[in-house]
Amino acid sequence: TYLDKIETPIIKQLVCLGAIEAFPLGGSDNLGRENLLPTRINFDYLVLCKGVPWGISTRAAKAKIINKFSTEESSVDSELSARFLKMKSLKGAVPNPAFKRFGDEWKSYMLLRVARLDAITFSDARKLIDNAYIDKSHYAKPGDKWLDSAARILISEGFDTTVDNRSAVMDYDTRFDAPAVYFGWYSTAPCRYFAIPAFSCAPAMIGWHIYSFSALSLTDKNFWTPVFAAKNSAATDGNVFEPYLSLTRNVDVFADCVFAKKMLPSEAAFAALPSLSWQNIYIGDPLYNPHKTPLSAQLENIARGKTDAYSQYSLIRNANLIAKTDGNAAAAAYLKQFEGKLPDTALVWKIAELSPARENILRAAKLLFDRKIFNDPQYVGLA
C-alpha cells in the first residue's frame, strides 16, 4: 500500500536524518501511521525521482465515483505534502493553508513541499536538472479568466505574448516559435506542435496544459505532462486523476508569483495550489531560477557579442517595452540595428509586425519565400 511502501519509509528516513524534527507520541493515528508531533521542517523540497510511483489508485473495477470530491485516488506527491495535516482519512482533498501565501508560512503549517524529476525517459528527466503563449479553450469561464490574467502579467513584463481565443489547441497558423512560457487548455492529448517530434520549446520553458489526466502516466507520450518534460520544460504541472478545475493549480496565481513577485517556479507552484492530499504534481528542479540572468544582463551579453539562437527573443522583449513608452516605430528601429547580426528569423518577423502595412508585407514575403520558414516546425507559425 501507499502508506507501507512509500510514505512511512520516506517519513522515517527524513526524521532519522533530521530533515524533519518530530516527537513520537506513541501509538498510531487514525490512519494507522506512527503518531508524530512535528516541530520543525529543515528542508525546502522533497524531490522524488524517476521510479517513485506518482499516483495512488483505488479505482479497480469501479465504474464511477459517487462523490467526486471524496475519493482515495490522489498523487503520491500531494499526499506526502499533507502528511502532518489533520485528516480523518485519505479520501478527498484538504485545503492548502499555504495557498496564496508567499513567504515561509508553509513551514509553520508543517507542510512538505514536494517536487519531482520524472519524464518519459531517464534522459528527459535529467534535462529537468522569452516568449509566452496562452491557449484558451472557452471550456469553462474560470479557466479562461486565469489565462487572461496570466497573459496580462506576461505582457506587462515585455514577453511577446500570443493569446489564442479559439476553443481548439493552437494550430499551425498560429505563431509558436521558441515558447518560453505556455499555459493552455483543454485537450485530452498533446497535439499540433506538441505532437511534432522535431519541435521543441525554448530551453527551461515554464508552463503546462490544464487537463484532468495530464499526468495519468509519466512514461507515455500521449499525456501532456511527460511531453512538456521531453520538450525542454523546466517547470510543469500535472494531474494524476480528475482534480476538478476549482482544485487545480491556479495559473494566474502562479504567473503573478513567478513574473511579478519574482519567486522561483517551485515556490510559486506551491503557493498556487488550493488543495493537498489531491491529484496534483509539480515536475521540475526546485532550485531552477528563471530570474538568475535578468533582461538587462541578457542585453549586456548581446552587446558584448555573446549571442545564441534565443538572443533575438531578449531583444524582442526589450522592443515590446520600448513600444509601450515610445511607440512601434521606435521599437522597430531598435530591432533593425540587430538584423543580420545574430539568428534573427523571429526578430525580422517582429519588425514586420511593428512596421507600417507596406513594409510589413515586404518583410513577411521575404521571410516566407527567402527563408522557407513553412518547412521549419520551429517557425512554421510565422508563415
Where on the chain are the PLM-derived regions?
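Alpha-helical linker/edge segments of TPR/alpha-solenoid repeat scaffolds
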Residues: P356-R363
